[in-house]
């Protein structure tokens, strides 16, 4: 199934890079195919750009920076709000593109379009609130203060699991601040990024302000990191790659924002109803087929309700439908490619070899080679991969704990620190866990925790900086201090 025969607006299906307001082939004619993970069929091709073309994107952004930063904040706001309106108006086509290239169920894709668009609206308005400060002067006859200025060109390297929202969350903040952007989307999911470029052009965003480059990830990323004209780099992806990009950006001393891996604990207190908690845990685990940095990775249940919780979890998990994301009533789509399936299988095999119990998860029922059936393991322990690694698959590992002190130690036993979930109605337990958990975000009695007002980000090896909220735009702003001296006395006659 091709994208073009599924869309009401065929112009949203672009198979070229977008640089300086122009749709661009690769100079050497190199291409790579993009596949539907549900069927394995190619849905299109994209160019592999040459080095000089990537540098040309930086040239375009550099030229556009002069004009874009000179606009008033309310003028940039108007263009971003026009972009927001177009995202909403084209939600169905954008969702279809996303499902075909990424695999997630169509309702989830629609939700991502809404979620991604909401950041455009949020930052369009936040750009008008980049206030400076007035500083009480310690210098006679002087006025002191600060102003906020755009940092410069921002390079945005985005993942395949949320191919639209991870772009808008970064790009809207940067553009609202006055910074042009160069987007490098994941090669598995380029078409969402290119559709965003088409709509940005329609919204009146000037040429060179929003660019999309395509090519071999390591080569393009290295070029962007090495170019001193790029002043900010924002990356969402694995901790391993994030460390590499941080190292590569050191020579040019870039402003670096990293949203990296997660290994979220889901803690269930002894006072919880097992059914309520289990249903919430299933939702936290299996969104996007587990391919989510916020997915519950280690489910830690008090020993007094462990068995009842496992029973309810297995029952709810069994009701999930796995299939092509374009089909109705599908809860889980495919994994992104065969390597992801192989990794999921290896994680399960490792756990079983180390003593875990397979409660459910018959892979013979998978509807295709890129699918992985929801899997439940109990008795998981710290030496297992399912405990130590971000599995990015529909594999749930459950274990029990005795008391709050033990579960805090278990939850913090990881290099990651992005998000944690706590389910309990005991206010003292809530406060104790909230303070003791080493995570950038803690959600209590709610699976949903993110959105435009939220400062999204982690601690430890889960990243640097925050996206969203009132501080998200600061990733793309410099604070300039001024001292106005020799102003004379302001005392009256």
From Swiss-Prot:
- As recorded in UniProt, its EC number(s) are 1.2.1.-
Effect of disrupting the coding gene: Cells lacking this gene are unable to grow on ectoine as sole carbon source.
Q: Which GO terms are recorded in the biological process aspect for this UniProt protein? A: ectoine catabolic process; gamma-aminobutyric acid catabolic process
Reactions catalysed, as given in the entry: L-aspartate 4-semialdehyde + NAD(+) + H2O = L-aspartate + NADH + 2 H(+)
Which CDD domains does the protein's record reference? ALDH_F5_SSADH_GabD
* Any one annotated GO CC term: cytoplasm
Matching entries from InterPro entries are given as: Ald_DH/histidinol_DH (IPR016161), Ald_DH_C (IPR016163), Ald_DH_CS_CYS (IPR016160), Ald_DH_CS_GLU (IPR029510), Ald_DH_N (IPR016162), Aldehyde_DH_dom (IPR015590), Aldehyde_DH_Superfamily (IPR050740)
Compartment(s) of residence: Cytoplasm
Q: Where does NADP(+) bind?
A: 160-161, 184-187, 237-238, 260, 390
| Active-site residues annotated for this sequence | 259, 293
GO MF: oxidoreductase activity, acting on the aldehyde or oxo group of donors, NAD or NADP as acceptor; succinate-semialdehyde dehydrogenase (NAD+) activity
Assigned keywords, A-Z: Cytoplasm, NAD, NADP, Oxidoreductase
Q: Does the keyword tRNA-binding apply?
A: no
Superkingdom of origin organism: Bacteria
Task: Give the main EC class.
Answer: oxidoreductase
Q: Which SUPFAM superfamilies match?
A: ALDH-like (SSF53720)
What is this protein for, i.e. what is its function? Answer: Involved in the degradation of ectoine, which allows H.elongata to utilize ectoine as both a carbon and a nitrogen source for growth. Probably catalyzes the NAD(+)-dependent oxidation of L-aspartate-semialdehyde to L-aspartate.
User: PANTHER family recorded for this chain?
Assistant: SUCCINATE-SEMIALDEHYDE DEHYDROGENASE, MITOCHONDRIAL
Protein family membership: Belongs to the aldehyde dehydrogenase family.
This protein is called Aspartate-semialdehyde dehydrogenase (Non-phosphorylating)
Species annotation: Halomonas elongata (strain ATCC 33173 / DSM 2581 / NBRC 15536 / NCIMB 2198 / 1H9)
């Amino acid at each position: 199934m091709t994208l073009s025969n599924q869309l009401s607006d065929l112009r949203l299906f672009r198979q070229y890079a977008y640089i300086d307001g122009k749709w661009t082939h690769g100079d050497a004619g190199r291409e790579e195919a993009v596949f539907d993970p549900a069927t394995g069929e190619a849905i299109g091709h994209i160019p592999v750009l040459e080095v000089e073309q990537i540098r040309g994107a930086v040239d375009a952004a550099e030229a556009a920076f002069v004009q874009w930063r000179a606009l008033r904040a309310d003028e940039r706001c108007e263009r971003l709000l026009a972009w927001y309106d177009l995202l909403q108006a084209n939600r169905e086509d954008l969702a279809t593109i996303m499902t075909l290239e990424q695999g997630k169920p169509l309702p989830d894709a629609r939700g991502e379009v809404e979620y991604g668009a909401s950041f455009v609206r949020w930052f369009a308005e936040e750009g008008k609130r980049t206030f400076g400060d007035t500083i009480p002067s310690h210098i006679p006859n002087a006025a002191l203060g600060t102003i906020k200025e755009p940092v410069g060109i921002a390079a945005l390297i985005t993942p395949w699991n949320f191919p639209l929202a991870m772009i808008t969350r970064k790009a809207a903040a940067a553009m609202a601040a006055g910074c042009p952007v160069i987007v490098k989307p994941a090669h598995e999911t380029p078409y969402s990024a290119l559709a965003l470029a088409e709509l940005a052009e329609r919204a009146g965003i000037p040429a060179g302000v929003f660019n999309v480059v395509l090519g071999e990830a390591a080569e393009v990323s290295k070029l962007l990191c090495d170019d001193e004209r790029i002043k900010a780099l924002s990356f969402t992806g694995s901790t391993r790659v994030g460390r590499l990009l941080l190292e590569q950006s050191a020579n040019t001393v870039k402003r670096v924002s990293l949203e990296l891996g997660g290994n979220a604990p889901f803690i269930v207190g002894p006072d919880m109803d097992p059914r309520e908690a289990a249903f919430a845990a299933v939702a936290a685990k299996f969104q996007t087929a587990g391919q989510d940095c916020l997915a519950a990775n280690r489910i830690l249940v008090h020993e007094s309700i462990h068995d009842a919780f496992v029973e309810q979890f297995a029952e709810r998990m069994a009701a999930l439908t796995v299939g092509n994301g374009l089909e109705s009533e599908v809860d889980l789509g495919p994994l992104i490619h065969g390597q992801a399936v192989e990794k999921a299988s290896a994680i399960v095999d490792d756990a079983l070899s180390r003593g875990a119990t397979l409660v459910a998860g018959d892979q013979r029922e998978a509807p295709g080679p890129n699918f992985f059936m929801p899997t439940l393991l109990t008795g998981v322990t710290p030496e297992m991969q399912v405990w130590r690694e971000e599995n990015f698959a529909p594999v749930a590992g459950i274990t029990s704990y005795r008391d709050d002190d033990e579960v805090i130690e278990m939850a913090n036993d990881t290099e990651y620190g992005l998000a944690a979930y706590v389910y309990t109605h005991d206010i003292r337990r809530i406060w104790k866990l909230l303070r003791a958990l080493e995570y950038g975000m803690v959600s209590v009695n709610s699976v949903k925790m993110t959105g435009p007002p939220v400062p999204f980000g982690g601690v430890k090896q889960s990243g640097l900086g925050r996206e969203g909220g009132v501080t998200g735009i600061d990733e793309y702003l410099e604070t300039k201090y001024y001292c106005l001296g020799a102003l004379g006395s302001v005392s009256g006659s």
